A protein has these predicted regions:
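Residue-level detector of functionally special positions within alpha-helical transmembrane segments
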Residues: 28, 105-107, 164, 169
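Mature extracellular/periplasmic domains of secretome proteins
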Residues: 1-25, 32-52, 57-77, 128, ...
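Loop and turn regions of beta-sandwich accessory domains that flank beta-strands and are enriched
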Residues: 177-270
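Acidic, glycine-rich active-site loops and adjacent beta-strand->loop/helix elements
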Residues: 27-30, 138-142, 255-257
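Predominant activation on well-ordered alpha-helical scaffold segments within soluble catalytic domains
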Residues: 5, 9, 110, 114-118, ...
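Extracellular S/T/G-rich loop segment that most often corresponds to the catalytic His/Ser-adjacent loop
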Residues: 40-122, 126
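C-terminal subdomain of the subtilisin-like protease fold in secreted/lumenal serine endopeptidases
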Residues: 1, 20-21, 47-48, 62, ...
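Short loop/turn segments at connectors of secondary-structure elements within structured domains
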Residues: 17-19, 79, 126, 219-221, ...
């Protein structure tokens, strides 16, 4: 809820004596029901790193939710191969032994990403929380390169709604972190509200569109979009934010959600 989101923000700005703590968050395992990480309020926070999962072949795990808010992917199960990790000792654990070799889900991918970030902090304890995100953007690998979800954004980075900026690369991330020069101070800008009384076409491929004018020239790290739409079946709606360069962020993708309205829902895109 709101208190948790406020705690994320405080952790980013006040943690580690002002450098900020890094919070990773699992993108979710709901792909089989057409779920999307942008519909998770905590994965949608710009103060968290949303992590999705890929198989050992670098392909999307069958359960891994996509989203415009996904920053990186990390390896997990999904193709018959699980993750080996420690377990509670004895019979009280997940298995009767002290290890398991079938850990998985984005709940496995996310701690793997956290471990990489810990190595980055060990290599350079002066990194800010934004530095960590920026380094991951620069060093993550373009896995599954033939997948059609990949696009090049206005900053020249390859990015995908399935994989974010790609599979996390521990060696590359630590190497870049070692001599990293911290980013300039963050600039926050708020625009709106933008109010438009639009009729939404039903049952066809046409779109309702309206332009948003932003006067500042900014180097954008992330965007939060608060959406308020009255609609009897929100699962019918696709919501896309398109940049002047043509980069499309699919904030909401139609699925079987039969609830009504988006009531001041905050979407995030990286």
């Amino acid at each position: 809820g709101p208190l948790t989101l406020a705690a994320f923000e405080e952790d980013a700005y006040q943690g580690r004596k002002g450098l900020g703590n890094t919070i990773t968050w699992a993108a979710g395992n709901g792909l089989g029901s057409d779920d999307d990480a942008n519909k998770d309020g905590y994965a949608n926070s710009r103060f968290t790193i949303a992590v999705t999962s890929v198989t050992h072949l670098g392909e999307q795990s069958y359960y891994a939710e996509p989203g415009a808010n996904i920053l990186v992917a990390a390896h997990s199960n999904g193709d018959g191969e699980g993750i080996t990790t420690t377990d509670i000792v004895g019979s009280g654990g997940y298995t009767t032994g002290n290890i398991t070799n079938n850990f998985g889900g984005t709940s496995s991918a996310t701690p793997l990403a956290s471990g990489v970030i810990a190595l980055m902090y060990d290599a350079n304890p002066f990194l800010t929380w934004r530095d960590v995100q920026e380094i991951l953007v620069h060093t993550s690998r373009m896995n599954d390169p033939s997948d059609l979800s990949w696009n090049t954004n206005g900053a020249g980075h390859n990015v995908s709604h399935k994989y974010g900026f790609g599979a996390i690369d521990a060696g590359a991330a630590v190497s870049l972190a070692t001599n990293w020069t911290s980013l300039d101070q963050e600039l926050n800008r708020t625009y709106g509200p933008f109010i438009e009384n639009l009729s939404i076409p039903d049952g066809n491929s046409s779109w309702s569109t309206f332009p948003i004018t932003v006067s500042s020239q900014l180097s954008i790290e992330s965007i939060d979009v608060i959406v308020d739409i009255d609609h009897t079946y929100r699962g019918d709606l696709d919501i896309i934010l398109e940049s002047p360069y043509g980069t499309e962020s699919w904030l909401a993708v139609s699925n079987g959600d039969s609830n009504n309205d988006y009531s001041d829902w905050q979407f995030n895109t990286v």
